[in-house]
């Protein structure tokens, strides 16, 4: 697995983590390992900090990592490490901000369990804190299996400090006794020279029901693949469109040339009317529709998930009328199916809804 591609690069990522995350919880309490005093010390370490932009055993437990769709451009090898750019010195790491469930979340405790683990793995404040051993210790302190850290390597690193925040968390599937939580993450890392690198990834976290809380069984980081040198016009247009807000893995999916033009053109059409917050495109999604043996459209580059439009979260019941209208608009841009919080045609073939799709819109395409 290509580590560089797992930690997808976004040169245009905002300087402040969470700037495009209106649903991420407000900071409630700083972990003792990274309090405000520690952050101030990190800001002046090495002179001052700078800000860098870099951007179960069954088939159903696997996460999308597939080849390009038929007819897609060929790809070039990935660079050995993420590219970076350095801003002026003097900016500290953003403060940790634990995920807090908003209105309308289905079984928020399930998401919270998955996200606590990822935040713990990807946040540290001292030299060696990004090592496998140190991250495993943080999971152990939470009462979780420390071996899970071995599956979350994109969040580890040699830097002396890092902060990981949740941009969005949606279900890849939620059943009575099992679940898939798709966590879209931003991560800042403070390097030894006092510079901050901004990057991120998406992780598919698998859980099973247990007492007193759900238990994590696996973590599957996104693996978008290398960027192509022959990206089509629709892909270039999506990447350049300021009204399409892409997380790191989704941006890398598009840059790889592994997303069908029908999906990209639909996103552009939606962006004429809304500011579109994308959560998932291809990588980081279960290969099979959760709980079934049916291949998902996502790993084939034939689907896109959206968690907010014009800053309005799909999951929030207060936005229901707006979301229903948006689902109808989405159906007009070419998908064969639109999933969301409401089944607008009562069992017809265009719309569908279930517990999994209360927190995002899903647009699936035949080609």
Which residue ranges define each predicted feature?
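N-terminal secretory signal peptides
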Residues: 1-38, 43-52
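N-terminal low-complexity, Pro/Thr-rich disordered segments
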Residues: 54-108, 233-234
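Core segments of small alpha/beta cavity-forming domains
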Residues: 93-157, 254-258
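Second-shell loop/turn segments in exported
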Residues: 100-105, 248-258, 290-293, 310-318
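A short, amphipathic edge element
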Residues: 154-171
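Exposed beta-sheet edge and beta->alpha loop/turn motif
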Residues: 176-221, 226
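Catalytic cores and adjacent binding grooves of peptidoglycan-active enzymes
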Residues: 206-237, 253, 265, 277, ...
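Extended, low-complexity, intrinsically disordered C-terminal regulatory tails
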Residues: 259-292
């Amino acid at each position: 697995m290509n580590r560089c591609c797992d930690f997808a690069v976004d040169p245009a990522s905002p300087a402040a983590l969470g700037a495009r995350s209106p649903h991420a919880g407000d900071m409630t309490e700083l972990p003792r390992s990274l309090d405000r005093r520690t952050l101030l010390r990190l800001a002046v370490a090495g002179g001052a900090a700078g800000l860098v932009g870099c951007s179960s055993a069954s088939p159903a437990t696997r996460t999308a990592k597939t080849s390009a769709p038929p007819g897609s451009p060929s790809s070039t090898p990935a660079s050995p490490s993420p590219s970076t750019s350095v801003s002026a010195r003097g900016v500290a790491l953003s403060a940790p901000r634990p995920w807090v469930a908003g209105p309308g979340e289905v079984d928020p405790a399930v998401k919270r369990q998955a996200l606590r683990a990822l935040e713990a793995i990807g946040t540290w404040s001292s030299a060696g804190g990004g090592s496998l051993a140190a991250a495993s210790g943080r999971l152990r302190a939470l009462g979780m299996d420390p071996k899970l850290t071995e599956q979350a390597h994109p969040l580890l690193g040699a830097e002396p400090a890092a902060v990981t925040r949740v941009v969005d968390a949606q279900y890849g599937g939620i059943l009575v006794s099992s679940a898939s939580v798709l966590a879209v993450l931003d991560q800042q890392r403070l390097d030894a020279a006092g510079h901050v690198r901004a990057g991120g990834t998406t992780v598919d976290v698998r859980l099973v029901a247990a007492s007193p809380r759900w238990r994590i069984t696996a973590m599957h980081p996104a693996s978008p693949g290398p960027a192509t040198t022959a990206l089509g016009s629709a892909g270039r247009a999506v990447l350049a469109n300021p009204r399409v807000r892409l997380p790191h893995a989704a941006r890398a999916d598009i840059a790889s040339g592994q997303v069908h033009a029908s999906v990209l053109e639909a996103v552009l059409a939606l962006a004429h009317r809304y500011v579109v917050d994308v959560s998932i495109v291809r990588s980081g999604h279960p290969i099979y529709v959760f709980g079934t043996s049916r291949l998902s459209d996502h790993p084939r580059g034939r689907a896109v998930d959206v968690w907010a439009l014009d800053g309005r979260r799909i999951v929030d019941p207060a936005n229901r009328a707006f979301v229903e209208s948006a689902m109808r608009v989405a159906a007009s841009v070419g998908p064969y199916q639109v999933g969301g919080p409401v089944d607008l045609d009562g069992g017809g073939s265009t719309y569908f809804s279930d517990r999994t799709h209360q927190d995002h819109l899903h647009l699936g395409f035949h080609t």
